[in-house]
Amino acid sequence: MQETEYINVYGARVHNLKDIDAEIPRNSLTVITGLSGSGKSSLAFDTIFAEGQRRYIETFSAYARNFLGNLERPDVDKITGLSPVISIEQKTTNKNPRSTVGTTTEIYDYLRLLYARAGVAYSYLSGEEMVKYTEEQILDLILKDYKGKKIYLLAPLVRSRKGHYRELFEQIRKKGYLYVRVDGEVREITHGMKLDRYKNHDVEVVIDKLVVAEKDDRRLKQSVATAMRQGDGLMMILDAQSESIRHYSKRLMCPVTGLSYREPAPHNFSFNSPQGACPKCKGLGVVNQIDVDKVIPDRELSIYEGAIAPLGKYKNAMIFWQIGALLEKYDATLKTPIKELPDDAIDEVLYGSDERIKIKSSLIGTSSDYFVTYEGVVKYIQMLQEKDASAIAQKWAEQFAKTTVCPECKGARLNKEALHFRIHDKNINELANMDINELYDWLMKVDEFLSDKQKKISVEILKEIRTRLKFLLDVGLDYLALNRSSVSLSGGESQRIRLATQIGSQLVNVLYILDEPSIGLHQRDNLRLINSLKELRDMGNSVIVVEHDKDMMLAADYVIDMGPKAGRLGGEVVFAGTPQEMLNTDTMTSQYLNGKMKIEIPAKRRKGNGKSIWLKGAKGNNLKNVDVEFPLGKLICVTGVSGSGKSTLINETLQPILSQKFYRSLQDPLEYDSIEGLENIDKVVDVDQSPLGRTPRSNPATYTGVFSDIRNLFVGLPEAKIRGYKPGRFSFNVAGGRCEACTGNGYKTIEMNFLPDVYVPCEVCHGKRYNRETPEVRFKGKSIADVLDMTINRAVEFFENVPQILNKIKVLQDVGLGYIKLGQSSTTLSGGESQRVKLATELSKRDTGKTLYILDEPTTGLHFEDIRVLMGVLNKLVDKGNTVIVIEHNLDVIKMADYIIDMGPEGGKGGGELLSYGTPEEVAKSPKGYTPKFLREELGL
């Protein structure tokens, strides 16, 4: 084959890559696999993608490059055959509450266009279909409806507004008009005429009064034109005999009430535009309100004793004097328990009073009484929530607030006008609320309900929407709705949305690199995902997938296996070829694929401790009033297809309930009826995949707390004592022992103006982070900088005789992180690695045997061998009497559980039910849902 048929990588040395060469066939689906830390991402993202991106940026002008990010050249000799590269990672980078599935995929933009062009408007006052006319149509209607009748032609000038309108009447009089209709009454305009300025008024000028002739009337035609001009496109007809009113407009207008709408445009249906957003919540669908139950948590107490949480116990302060004076009129005092106060009194304490309150002179030490208005505790908290309040004050005020659905738009995000445009009885929000499956079905059938005009307008728009929805269905996201917030999506979901968007873009000759797209996918949906990737390939693209999934590897055209181990012991290509060739080799990956190695099914399932937590009546999101038992002392696995309600049940209902109980967490759980059995546990630990820290200074040593022990060890050394060093001397975060040239970072950022910033090792400390004196203190010949540069495996050997340090480092090795460095920046760790650092930190703490651990997809980023190691760790926890709940799709984990809770049967609205529960063997026999079928195959039943 010619070289151009391959992407060739020569001499890659990024991170732990050992000067490797790799050959990847173009226009094929290639899987890069291997143990965690073996160099998969280093090859795919940090070498191939980084070089592709750098070359793309180099095509820009120097001026344009100045505004782009830092793009260092990866440490590689050369790469040939590279196409333009698009990376689709699993990071959920979008934290914007305004971003939704619909806006990300641009499907909502097409829906806005559809409603602006083909939507039918209805009045939000009367429910009548809105109409708009030309002047000729208005003339014909008047001749038809009022033939032979005496009518007044009116032009509306003021619509329900306060004012005396003296100047307006004078202007009308000067134009030669003699009459106006004010608040439904026709009046002659007199000199100096004015209205009550404090009341709302409707004012129309009488353009003409006439009897409608039987034939076309020139006077009527002129009067209609004048009325339209004076009324800015609106006019009214008053029947002199019946006094009934009809409205006419060139704009969209309700014929009954005269309500008019702006001409619809796509931005009128956008919740991110002032023209379309709900005015109350500004298009967010939720508002922040003060929660009275958080302000007054204990009604047994009096205000004096601290019943009002924001105020605390009584102190000599104006607000307490005001409340005391306010309560006097209810024959109560500050020492009256809240539960004995009348509701009116509590309302005034919270929301203030219009009355002026008398503060006695004896309280404030003045010669006379003092009168003030009292604005209430709620107003006081709201003031601290304002933008100009300090961050500390805002954070303090937040604890008394709760996020509730906007009372005006009911969570729809749009204003009343936008919500009253319909297509086949559905407004745009109702479509955005449907799950993608339901929406696709609705759009496939909607043609038969459209008028010929609507069909002609919407044919191309509908085609685009259907195509994009089909791609979302193909990647297993049928359970999502378009209005689902991007913030609430998992990494796997947001990655698959970006994948669907890319398939929809129809690009060719592109290299796509994906990071574990199967994350969060049930086995049922895996085949659809694989077919989507093949579709991307068949369009003429190259697809590289970093993946551990067995089905994905076997479906690939080409597999590259990195290894043989992780970290320093990895970074080599141990196999490259077709999946069939791989099955005949003896790499660790191939042994798991061909069955020589496997994760064994436990000989027996644990019985637990006989106690349980019962969660009853869970109704959050799509949960259908489920009652779930969590037997304690077991490894519990929560399963089900994507969107079936697993995360809602565990992460959004159970975990917040437990966090509120044990740690007074401010996160509110979703709706449920009751929970029983909390006395059977004394601690809950949620081990998630969020980064360890917000800065590059955070690392495994600082997060686990072992760095403090290491610093104390160095402080106790004779050399450190002679020099009088304290623990701060060995910290790179504070002045004293760190290198001040780079402030302890180990590198300096060089701004290149017209080129990307360059990160160079600090020329003073050479990347060691410390000044010259600090590393002179050595333990076993190693300085503290050397210790931070050690891998966990090396550190375990080094500190084998220091139990306090060894215990904390050993657990990092036990969870399969022996290859990472003690001082490795947390920003370079993957989500799965961060989760395991947190798990190790919890393992190193003393447990009580009554702890509940919650893990969401702990196998993310893990090879078969890593999963075996991780399961060993989790089993140790359970063997000590603790309970572990994992949300998981991986069958190797599911088959090792003591107890399974299977949710489903489908995702979204079709899910939310408890299908089966019990041991894997019991669940495998269930006829409901998809999990039992795959479990039967795995267990060999």
Tell where the protein language model's regions lie, with residue ranges.
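Conserved phosphate-binding elements of NTP-dependent enzyme cores
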Residues: 1-941
